[in-house]
UniProtKB/Swiss-Prot annotation:
This is B9 domain-containing protein 1. Disruption phenotype: Viable and fertile. Results in lack of localization of the tectonic-like module proteins, namely MKS1 and B9d2, to the transition zone resulting in minor defects in sensory cilia. Probable component of the tectonic-like complex (also named MKS complex), a complex localized at the transition zone of primary cilia. Required for ciliary structure and function. It comes from Drosophila melanogaster. Pfam families: B9-C2. Residues 53-197 form the C2 B9-type domain.
Amino acid sequence: MSASEGISLPGNEETTPPHEKHKQKAKKAKKKSRSAKESVPNAMDAKATASYFSLSIVGQIVSATFPLGPDKEFVFLRYEMVAGPDWQLSSGPQHGLTQLATNRRGHFNEPIVFNMPIEVTYKSTSPYGWPQILVTVFGRSGLGRETLLGYAHIHLPVFGSRRPADQTEQLQAPILMPKCPNMMADITSWLLRREPELKDPKVLLDNLKCKGLSMESYGSLQFQLSSVMRGARKLGYHWHS
């Protein structure tokens, strides 16, 4: 029989009681859970970093004005929100149609009031392709015949939170009417009693595409728009009014 068999040498024996071992394991498990919880907010903070900014627009298309009066008895507008590929419409309608309006009861060059509300929100990662409002102006005669009166477009404002004293300030956009390219087209337009129309009015929003168009201005549209922007500074965009 060797001396080591059946004999517990000093230093080889375990002095920790079983209930103390259980407490130590519980403490280690708590430390691991705490470290895991502390690492989760850091990952969430990384994901919460702003990846886009938002632009909210509230306002209205107020009225249309023609210096010598409109050619038709009634006028109505059709508008469309147009933006670049980096912009996404989060809320609000992309298209809209106003009611029929007239100024025949007043002076011929008085504003034709629409007060068409506009409320949209966009989000984007880049200011390229800043949103615009493209408006097509139509006229309707007493017999129900509709003809084109022109086009208008305007960029949504970057800054629009006005002070109370400036709330009556309005933005204006000229109403543009296409001209016939030659005499034959002019005669055809006169015989058919129809003004020339653009196949795709969005070409007016691109300076390169509308360079060769012949347009004339007749009248203007009045807008009242205010804007609220969020998250632009986090992406490094600093605009100053």
